[in-house]
Amino acid sequence: MIKEAIVKIVNKEDLTYDEAYAVMNEIMGGETTSTQNAAFLAALSTKSAKAETTDEIAGCAAAMREHAVQVKTGMDVFEIVGTGGDNAQSFNISTTSALVAAAGGMKVAKHGNRAASSLCGTADCLEALGVNIDQSPEKCVELLNKVGMCFFFAQKYHTSMKYVGPIRKELGFRTVFNILGPLTNPGSPAMQLLGVYDEYLVEPLAQVLVSLGVKRGMVVYGMDKLDEISMSASTKICEIKDGWFRTTVISPEDFGFERCTKEDLKGGTPEENAKIVRDILGGQKGHKRNAVLMNAGASLYIGGKADSMKEGIELAAEIIDSGKALETLDKLIDVSNS
C-alpha cells in the first residue's frame, strides 16, 4: 500500500482515512523499508500548503494507537504539548507549564520524546533535570498519584516508532509524527492543551481531540508560527468544552503582559534548558516566566482550577511564588528515581 500512497501523494492527491490507516499500519508493523518511510513522510509533509488533512491525521493516529501500549490511569489526566516543527528553538515552555499545573493539583501525563527538529525535546529536558524518564506503566500511575505528574517516554510506549525514529532525526523537519505524538498519549487524556505549527490545523485538530475522548481543552496557534500560546504575537485558540467549540484570538496585552520577541524565549542545550526551568520555578522574573504563566494559566483553566484564563494566570503566579512548583519538580525527581 505504501508505494501506491507515495505515488498518490506525489501527484498532490489526498489519502482517504482507510488509506492513511493502512499505510501507517504497515509502517508500525515493520513491513516497509526505511527509504519508503522517508519518501512517504517527506511527500506527505510537502503535498500541500495546508499540511495533512483531517482524514490523513485521524487514519494515521488510529493505526499508531493500536500499536502502542495503553495505560489505565483510573483518573482524568491532562496533557500540555506542542506539535513541534515551528523551528522557534524556544525553551521547554510546555514542560515548565506542566510542572506548574501539577503543583496546582492537576494530574499531568506528559508524553514525548527526544528532540526531532529542535535542540531539546521534553525527554531531553526532563532527563537533564534529573528525572528518570524510563518508567513502567505502573510507575507512571504511582507518579501521578504521589506527585501529580508523570512522563510517558514515547520510545517505551510506542516501540514501533523504532522504524521511523532515526528517519525523523535525519530529515530534520516536521512530519506527520509531530501531529501524531500529541494524539497518541498512552494515558488517553480527558483534558489537553495542544499547540500546533499551522493555523490550518486549529479547528480540525480540535475535532480530532473530541473524537479521541477529550472533554476540555484548547488547540492553540501563535500567529508568529509558534506552537504555544505566544508572548510575541496574538494566538488563535479553539476551546473545547464538553463537545462544543469556540474559536477566539487572544494577545499578551489582554492579560497585562508586554510582548517580547521570539528571541527572548530561545532555549539551548538540554542542560541550558534545565537551568531555565529551575530559574523560572525558582521565581525568576522576565519574558520566559510570562510565557509559562500564559500557558500554565490556560492549563489551570482547562483543568477547572480557575474560572477563567485570567484567574488561571494569577493562580500560576501564586503557585510559582509559593515554591510549590519547584517542590513538585524536586518530588518528581525523587520519586522517579526511587
Swiss-Prot record:
It catalyses: N-(5-phospho-beta-D-ribosyl)anthranilate + diphosphate = 5-phospho-alpha-D-ribose 1-diphosphate + anthranilate. One of its GO terms (biological process) is L-tryptophan biosynthetic process. GO terms for cellular component: cytosol. GO terms for molecular function: anthranilate phosphoribosyltransferase activity; magnesium ion binding. The keyword Magnesium applies. InterPro entries: Anthranilate_Pribosyl_Tfrase (IPR005940), Glycosyl_Trfase_fam3 (IPR000312), Glycosyl_Trfase_fam3_N_dom (IPR017459), Glycosyl_Trfase_fam3_N_dom_sf (IPR036320), Nuc_phospho_transferase (IPR035902). It is an enzyme of class 2 (transferase). Transmembrane segments: none annotated. Belongs to the anthranilate phosphoribosyltransferase family. This is Anthranilate phosphoribosyltransferase.
